């Protein structure tokens, strides 16, 4: 096989694996269906629905793809991400649609939340220091000191996220109800080391982090 053909095949392979670029303007029109729960600009008013505004584009796209796969009728146990409230919501969206939605919500400005003053100290200790005696690293390593996350690595933005939603996700990771954190099970292994009090404190701290 000549070098030119090899190069062509490699190029086609790489192109086939690449995700379509999202169009924020197109995503705005497609986001109307999302507004009832997540707010028109991705800043949800209900504490059980996550804020999407300002979230990392790669992370948002992956979560939507996982939720679409995990909520399909007959989806194998452990596949994707199962979110009961999202059942059927993404079925008619193409990969390009999802990319456009991710681009739109990423472009929106997130609102700032507030932490419970009584939980700030405990939450800050966990977020910035982890529980080293138990082998739990600080959250700052992946999610950054100010909670902005790591966009290239698809680690989510946490800053200002609703405490109720964060607590639910940590609990789900701890109990194995959410499993889309990769083969290394990083969030499941971390959440396994958190008590209910730990989860309440760190979730509240994250809500006020900015």
UniProtKB/Swiss-Prot annotation:
Its main location: periplasm. This is Cytochrome c4. Diheme, high potential cytochrome c believed to be an intermediate electron donor to terminal oxidation systems. Pfam families: Cytochrom_C. Residues 1-20 form the signal peptide. Keywords: Electron transport, Heme, Iron, Metal-binding, Periplasm, Signal, Transport. The keyword Transcription regulation does not apply. Heme c 1 binds at residues 34, 37-38, 86. GO terms for molecular function: electron transfer activity; heme binding; iron ion binding. It is found in: Periplasm. Binds 2 heme c groups covalently per subunit. One of its GO terms (cellular component) is periplasmic space. PANTHER family: CBB3-TYPE CYTOCHROME C OXIDASE SUBUNIT FIXP, CYTOCHROME C4. It comes from Azotobacter vinelandii. Heme c 2 binds at residues 139, 142-143, 187.
